[in-house]
Amino acid sequence: MGIELLCLFFLFLGRNDHVQGGCAMGGAETCEDCLLIGPQCAWCSQENFTHLSGVGERCDTPANLLAKGCQLTFIENPVSQVEILTNKPLSIGRQKNSSNIVQISPQSLALKLRPGLEQTLQVQVRQTEDYPVDLYYLMDLSASMDDDLNTIKELGSLLSKEMSKLTSNFRLGFGSFVEKPISPFMKTTPEEIANPCSSIPYFCLPTFGFKHILPLTNDAERFNEIVKNQKISANIDTPEGGFDAIMQAAVCKEKIGWRNDSLHLLVFVSDADSHFGMDSKLAGIVIPNDGLCHLDSKNEYSMSTILEYPTIGQLIDKLVQNNVLLIFAVTQEQVHLYENYAKLIPGATVGVLQKDSGNILQLIISAYEELRSEVELEVLGDTEGLNLSFTAICNSGVPFPHQKKCSHMKVGDTASFNVTVSLPNCERRSRHVILKPVGLGDALEILVSPECSCDCQKEVEVNSSKCSNGNGSFQCGVCACNPGHVGHHCECGEDTLSTESCKEAPELPSCSGRGDCYCGQCVCHLSPYGNIYGPYCQCDNFSCVRHKGLLCGDNGDCDCGECVCRSGWTGEYCNCTTSTDPCVSEDGILCSGRGDCVCGKCICTNPGASGPACERCPTCSDPCNSKRNCIECYLSADGQAQEECVDKCKLAGATINEEEDFSKDSSVSCSLQGENECLITFLLTTDNEGKTVIHSIEKDCPKPPNIPMIMLGVSLAILLIGVALLCIWKLLVSFHDRKEVAKFEAERSKAKWQTGTNPLYRGSTSTFKNVTYKHKEKQKVDLSTDG
């Protein structure tokens, strides 16, 4: 018992505890009402768990109830339950007795569902080996199928031989169809009724709807003999009455010979489309097809001219109900039509038939192998209001959500399906649901019942002393009052109870329509939006106006329909701040002096001003330059003339204040260029009325130049430059002289003079020879004379 309670405890904590307050706000007054609110809700049946006004608090999530002090044993929280009634193991390998074959597990179970809670079941399907096969060959015998009839005369033997490789228990039968024997589907002259082919001329059988010719048998030669004896017939329009034949072949179980424990294959062979639904109204037939067997003593369809063609939906119901798998063998021209039919019919396949049915054998074998390689679940029974979802786990082991079919399976492989079932609401009735593999006789039967009641409802104290001395019955921790008494403990009588004391005004509803009047006092309802309070439940904390989707702009508290703003906020929505900080421009002036600060935003009043702080104003004048006349007048005027400057300052919208008691942090510094290159500096501020005030006016003018000092300085500079140049010249000359002297001394030291000879001396006598004078002596005389 302790382990069970511990498991329940963790179950309670883990289930839907994210839903906070949804159960308690539902206003449930009984355990059953609480369960209907949602699957996350539970009821506390513990006595004296809540006070007078809190019966609804008994309904909450399990975790919340535990937190409130409810003991675990008193928490009513029924869960969905699954009871497996029959669960035989799946058959393995070949079975000698086909009646003992089990291909689905489990076979039956009972399911109790808590509304809103999902319950998952696992279903396993395994196709057994060597499963018996019943094949019924349904052939179109209209005139266009004459060559096909000749081709299949030996089909029985060939088909039995091939199928023996796949199963040791094979039977086959034969039936044929043409069309409803009534105008306008056939010609109605006596000659053409007797012989529809008389215009060719050729003899053929009269038009007929459906004939069951050979019941299912394992005698292949008998099948061949029957086929050889068949004759064709004819009709007018191209579509045939094949769907009439399919319906009769599916529902006439005894006459066809379908076995309960075999695979039912219905091979439909035709080269034309089929009539269905209301096509027979052309012939005046208006009675809907009843889906019953109507084969007469001659095994012919007796209601062909009375009942309409079956609809696709009717065919689906009967084929699934009788586990018949349909194989459409049709010509290439008709394939696209029958593929559309096959998409709607569970287990149906389509094969392309050659003109003369030459490939019919291979077509049947291929279709059989395809059907045996697929496992698909079909849902039957009362599923209205029931939510079902499937997840297929095929031989690869990979789950495929929202799929109830496995393909490419081998015989003997196990296909698993997780089936999730849920009920959206509580309906006081049980449902019978069947899950079956398409084409197989095995099925899982499920009895689904709603779980909407509490165990504590079984224990009732009638006329309990806990309910004001027997004025009611005590059940699940609360009182159910007898007639004439009301109140949570049945303490008030209806004859003495008046609701007038619960009305704020005579014309208003009791407790403002948001509470219940118990013994002359209002007990306000719980609301998921907030608290309802007041002596008449007239107040709440959630009905105030909203700003940008937030209650009281998220800057105040809602009290009885009105916003109570927090500090720093005002307005009906508490969306208006009292702070002016957002309105101060970069120069420190409120709205740049061009507007008013309202709710933390600047409303520009100067024409042309814009921007968050009215800082942009192409048409506005410079605030500093606009005060030039006022400032210059103030600086140039003497004591009496300053009064004349007041008017100029008024025109500029400013006043001059020589006092120093102002905040320099919020001031604007201005500089103006005046006459004689004087620089005027002053500060601008705004007073409480928004007017401009001028402070700290200063004028700084440059001094005139000192000409004598400038001339003296220039003269001294010229003199100094001259002296410097002379010094430089002297240095250069001295450097050159020293260089020459050094060179001379070096040359002198290298010379080697002869004794008594001055190397620097040059004689004063020079001798020249006259080349034209030939007398040598005279030359000598001349030379000596010269010397």
UniProtKB/Swiss-Prot annotation:
Full protein name: Integrin beta-6
Gene Ontology MF: a single term: metal ion binding
Domain PSI: 22-71
Organism this protein belongs to: Ovis aries (Sheep)
Record's subunit section: Heterodimer of an alpha and a beta subunit. Interacts with FLNB. Interacts with HAX1. ITGAV:ITGB6 interacts with FBN1. ITGAV:ITGB6 interacts with TGFB1.
Every VWFA domain range: 131-371
Residues covered by the I-EGF domain: 456-491, 492-538, 539-575, 576-615
Listed transmembrane segments: 709-729
Alphabetical list of PANTHER family matching this protein: INTEGRIN BETA SUBUNIT, INTEGRIN BETA-6
InterPro entries (alphabetical): EGF_extracell (IPR013111), I-EGF_1 (IPR040622), Integrin_beta_N (IPR033760), Integrin_bsu (IPR015812), Integrin_bsu_cyt_dom (IPR014836), Integrin_bsu_tail (IPR012896), Integrin_bsu_tail_dom_sf (IPR036349), Integrin_bsu_VWA (IPR002369)
Residues reported in the UniProt entry to bind Ca(2+) 1: S144, D147, D148, D271, K355
UniProt membrane topology term: Single-pass type I membrane protein
Primary gene name: ITGB6
